[in-house]
Amino acid sequence: MGQKVHPKGFRLGIIRDWDSRWFANDKDFEKYVLEDYKIRRHIKEKLYNAGISRIEIERAAKRVKVIIHTAKPGIVIGRAGSGVEALRKELEKLTGGKTISLDIKEIKVPELDAQLVAENIAAQLEKRVSFRKAMKQAMARALRSGAKGIKTMVSGRLGGADIARTEWYKEGRIPLQTLRADIDYGFAEAHTTYGRIGVKTWIYKGDILPQKAAASEKGGDK
């Protein structure tokens, strides 16, 4: 089942945290989930070229904190912070006047971010680059940047073929069943003249010991 379950959801509460962190009663839960979806969709569409990997949302009463992880913070922030201010006003309007605070975090090594790697491969496929070339170049960059393993998969009418198929390449280790393994997962779609091509990426960065286990090991060493 390790091949089927979402690598991030599988590790929630162990080495990963939720991207949306808030509590709501039954009456507000549906509204907040829809609001989170609209916030993420708006940011991704508005700042598609900013290399946004992940958007975290925290709520407290009428305040909403949005944390944007991006490879190009300059595009998000804009000249003298004009981009952030404009985005904040748009999100306040989207959420019905709630107080929005934005926190921009830079992704230091975008070659090790699975979502950005998948989007990069998809962008190349839209430019008619060979899918094999795009996948192998992305894998080589990730391994050079320190990844311990990477797997990329593309699915659809590859090269304009009449029959859709799936192809994948793998380098190094991808221990999907090991819960302490820090495996990043990303998915993107390439919109080509032949139809959509799905791109999936798994990147293994090493092991993360859960805090309790790490603390007990540290105590045992003494």
Curated annotation (Swiss-Prot):
Gene3D superfamilies in UniProt: 3.30.300.20, Ribosomal protein S3, C-terminal domain
Source superkingdom: Bacteria
Cellular compartments per GO CC: cytosolic small ribosomal subunit
Single GO BP term: translation
SMART domains registered for this protein in UniProt: KH
GO MF annotations in UniProt: mRNA binding; rRNA binding; structural constituent of ribosome
UniProt keyword annotation of Transcription present: no
Pfam families: KH_2, Ribosomal_S3_C
KH type-2 domain ranges (all copies): 39-108
Record bears the keyword Disulfide bond: no
Entries under InterPro entries matching the protein: KH_dom, KH_dom-like_a/b, KH_dom_type_2, KH_sf_prok-type, Ribosomal_S3_C_sf, Ribosomal_uS3_bac-typ, Ribosomal_uS3_C, Ribosomal_uS3_CS
Keywords: Ribonucleoprotein, Ribosomal protein, RNA-binding, rRNA-binding
CDD domains linked to this entry: KH-II_30S_S3
PROSITE patterns documented for this protein: KH_TYPE_2 (PS50823), RIBOSOMAL_S3 (PS00548)
Family statement drawn from the similarity comment of this UniProt entry: Belongs to the universal ribosomal protein uS3 family.
Oligomer status and interactors: Part of the 30S ribosomal subunit. Forms a tight complex with proteins S10 and S14.
Function per UniProt: Binds the lower part of the 30S subunit head. Binds mRNA in the 70S ribosome, positioning it for translation.
PANTHER family: 30S/40S RIBOSOMAL PROTEIN S3 (PTHR11760), SMALL RIBOSOMAL SUBUNIT PROTEIN US3C (PTHR11760:SF19)
Name recorded for this polypeptide: Small ribosomal subunit protein uS3
Organism: Caldicellulosiruptor bescii (strain ATCC BAA-1888 / DSM 6725 / KCTC 15123 / Z-1320)
